[in-house]
């Protein structure tokens, strides 16, 4: 079976994002020097102050105009893509029912969402929309621990969203919780369908990982301790990215901007790993076959983008040996993506020589592990497992990070229970 993925980004620069930040102390000193410039003439001091203020005003005005223009462009793009998507969806009742359920679900969890959104936009720990590539939505958000001493372990997170509604902001709650435990988090955005297909999503994820590997030290992250995490569709995209990179490195592939060896482990949360088994399942739940096959670039590409199939391919045996440790998490009451997906992927990994662990959570649904449980507060078993693995790799981890703080409740229990009943996931 042909399992190699053409390197769509070979002709493009590997790093087109923001330059790493300069020293905060240097920036503060420069700002203070400008503010303290003399107002009286003599040696040109007054002129210098007026020029600095005028230049700063022009820069701010230009920046504001750029933001307005970008917002207008993104609004237009979103509207156009929505219309395209609606043409794909047609008037089938299943997706309409799912959409209405999603609205009810969102309303019931709104008390928690409001608090997370406030944190996302106003916390000094969040560095939003760092550019990592040339394509639309090639942005990532950084969640930086308050303790800036030393380099921190890093999580590169690929969010879910059924390959259609994924957004880097969905990782805000996870980013916050991990940052509280001394872990720097990079939430990678990527093109969704119909703006891109699965090949574009994998390409974007790969470029985002490359940016993290090559630049995270400038933000206080440790390039020797990077962990890849994916949830739902993001778990599938991240697993595909990981395997395609391993296949490239094990063969005669082109030179890449990052290496599998730079990742300490992969955590897959509620992921789907065999698309051949999921086509009919998704169709029954409202993600119609025609749309799903369009996302996956046709029925002939399902095997190429099925991590379980790739792992079983004898031609990929040398690539599997390059994989980092793999940890899979799944709820047994997940109806969006059955837990059998993680179980089968775990078995295939073990049978082909990969180091893998599987954690099943009785009675947990598709969103319990990632959303309802963190909003509930208290002990978060999934988060504890991830944090334990990361900090166990660092014998010098401080006691304050090993002692997991108890998170406060963000949504009343009765609203969480109702949300669980109406959840479309």
From Swiss-Prot:
Its EC number is 3.1.1.n2. Residues 1-10 have a biased composition (Basic and acidic residues). It is a multi-pass membrane protein. Keywords: Endoplasmic reticulum, Golgi apparatus, Hydrolase, Membrane, Transmembrane, Transmembrane helix. GO terms for molecular function: prenylcysteine methylesterase activity. The chain crosses the membrane at residues 99-119, 154-174. InterPro entries: AB_hydrolase_fold, BD-FAE-like_dom, GDXG_lipolytic_enzyme. Residues 24-34 have a biased composition (Low complexity). PANTHER family: AB HYDROLASE SUPERFAMILY PROTEIN C4A8.06C, KYNURENINE FORMAMIDASE. Catalyzes the demethylation of isoprenylcysteine methylesters. Belongs to the AB hydrolase superfamily. Isoprenylcysteine methylesterase family. This is Probable isoprenylcysteine alpha-carbonyl methylesterase ICMEL1. It comes from Oryza sativa subsp. japonica (Rice). The gene is IMCEL1.
